[in-house]
């Protein structure tokens, strides 16, 4: 299955639950950013950086955050951080696997599977235009904006 057809539950910027697929956004450029976990320091900073730059991003792209967290977790994260973009729940990591961001990771010598922080720009037809892999949170949204406004 191609990533355009994968359907995931998510919440819109008002917190309403919907089923989404990339093909739902045909005609719009999309920033699809994958992050490991709601309410962790790096993920919160990245989400807040996107939130704080939505006035600059919205005319150019639709921003969508994706993590393996469930809808309940996303809703709490969205409310706590006042997030103003779509969050998708990829609990079975179908979309993460389609974008090759579901990877073996290691912490304190323990290996586990998780999201490799990555961002993808999809064009109006849902095709990959640009990718940022192994993202460092600091300055990332500025880098994305720099690319979008060049």
Protein language model features and the residues they cover:
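Chalcogenol-based redox active-site neighborhoods
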Residues: 1-150
